[in-house]
UniProtKB/Swiss-Prot annotation:
Principal cellular location given in the protein's record: nucleus
Motif stretch (Nuclear localization signal 2): 163-170
Annotated protein name in UniProt: Putative OVARIAN TUMOR DOMAIN-containing deubiquitinating enzyme 8
Domain of life of the native organism: Eukaryota
Organism: Arabidopsis thaliana
């Protein structure tokens, strides 16, 4: 039974494709490449996402529904050839997807657990790379802030020096003018 967390369709697809419903984020990411509106986790999947999933993974998806008028639906990839893999899912009461298997076939026998482990490792590496990238971006942002503060400090220092120079020049000018006035006054006596 898939968790009812808004990711049930992607969990069911991950379970069918990789025998690991925890790979639902990877499945979502692959489908999102085709349909950007689904990038938010817990955004419900629908018929469109099943069509995209059939295309992305080149599989036939058979969806058993609880709808009397439509007991099942098939989703095929756009390619003309018949897909090698068929996956089965259920859609209950119009609100929840599950991964289902034929009774005589055990879940683990569908493929080796090593492929599931490889997918899990790929997902973990991707998460680690994203975290590392985020960390690098944060460091770069902090370095830029530090550089801006340093530049601001230098600019303030330069402004202070410029004001000091302007004050000295003004004082010199005033002194010179005063001297000229005194000198002029001296001659008029």
């Amino acid at each position: 039974m898939m968790k009812s967390d808004g990711n049930c369709q992607f969990r069911a697809l991950a379970d069918q494709l990789y025998q690991n419903s925890d790979c639902h984020e990877l499945v979502r990411q692959e489908i999102v490449k085709q349909n950007m509106s689904l990038s938010t986790n817990s955004q419900w999947g629908d018929e469109v996402t099943l069509r995209v999933a059939a295309d992305v993974y080149q599989v036939k998806i058979i969806l058993i529904t609880s709808i009397k008028l439509i007991p099942f639906m098939e989703f095929l990839p756009k390619s003309q050839k018949e897909p090698d893999k068929v996956i089965h899912m259920s859609y209950l009461a119009g609100i929840h997807f599950n991964s289902i298997y034929k009774k005589n076939k055990e879940k683990g026998s569908r493929s080796s657990s090593s492929s599931s482990s490889a997918v899990w490792m790929k997902l973990q590496r991707k998460k680690e790379n994203e975290a590392k990238k985020k960390e690098e971006e944060e460091k770069e942002r902090k370095d830029m802030e530090k550089e801006e503060k340093k530049k601001d400090k230098e600019d303030k220092k330069k402004d202070k020096e410029d004001k000091k120079k302007a004050k000295v020049q003004k004082e010199k000018k005033e002194k010179k003018e005063k001297k000229n006035r005194n000198h002029h006054f001296h001659y008029s006596e």
